[in-house]
């Protein structure tokens, strides 16, 4: 299910680990809301304008900048640089420059990473827009991995027709856009590209090769991209260490 905003905001852009970015600002960038999801729990999200291409669940830097005589909050993929000392967040969707998205700054979320990181450990910036193993000067502070990128979440009683890309599932708990799927009738390298607001229908990146009537498994990595699950509390990149 999508996150439900709990702070009284009316008419908000869909706030979820799935859905689409928007080319029109629906709120003032910089707005922070609290929201809750039945599976991922509560969290905080800041409304930002993408100032470059951002990958799914990418690690981003949040930067206030002036535009048209007012302050605006922009986000870009975090550079692979030590001692940044900058505010970070996790993008809830893929975006390109000029689009508006929600960025998670507290709560539990998958983070796009270069490698699997063990649960209950710190992590750091490993590449532009990606987390990974911690290293000197690159730690993501106020954040910790709570589930490794080797996590799998299987759903029984899934159904879908051969040649289509719409899969009906019992619920979307533990699934998110970008997660890798496998099972009878699921094409190789298939990912989830969208999840219906009901949480019971997902759109796949490839058509099913045969009718699906059974278990489909989501894996949090494809041996190249790893979605480690992190607990965030307004994270920031490590600053000077000398």
PLM region descriptions:
Residues 1-2, 54, 60, 90, ...:
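Generic hydrophobic secondary-structure signal
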Residues 2-153, 219-242:
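Glycine-anchored, exposed beta-strand/edge motif detector
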Residues 83-84, 95, 151-231, 241:
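Small/polar beta-strand repeat architecture
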């Amino acid at each position: 299910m999508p996150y439900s905003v709990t702070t009284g905001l009316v008419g908000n852009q869909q706030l979820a680990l799935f859905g689409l970015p928007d080319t029109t600002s629906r709120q003032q960038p910089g707005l922070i809301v609290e929201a809750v999801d039945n599976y991922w729990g509560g969290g905080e999200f800041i409304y930002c304008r993408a100032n470059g291409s951002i990958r799914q669940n990418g690690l981003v830097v949040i930067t206030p900048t002036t535009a048209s005589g007012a302050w605006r909050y922009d986000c870009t993929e975090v550079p692979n640089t030590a001692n940044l000392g900058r505010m970070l967040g996790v993008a809830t969707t893929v975006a390109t420059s000029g689009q508006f998205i929600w960025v998670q700054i507290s709560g539990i979320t998958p983070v796009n990473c270069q490698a699997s990181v063990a649960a209950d450990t710190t992590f750091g910036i490993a590449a532009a827009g990606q987390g990974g193993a911690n290293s000197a000067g690159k730690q993501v502070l106020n954040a910790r991995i709570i589930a490794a990128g080797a996590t799998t979440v299987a759903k029984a009683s899934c159904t879908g027709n051969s040649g289509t890309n719409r899969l009906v599932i019992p619920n979307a708990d533990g699934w998110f856009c970008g997660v890798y799927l496998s099972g009878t009738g699921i094409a190789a390298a298939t990912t989830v590209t969208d999840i219906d607001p009901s949480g019971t229908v997902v759109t796949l990146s490839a058509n099913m090769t045969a009718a699906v009537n059974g278990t489909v498994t989501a894996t949090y990595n494809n041996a190249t991209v790893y979605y480690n699950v992190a607990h965030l509390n307004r994270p920031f990149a490590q600053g000077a260490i000398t």
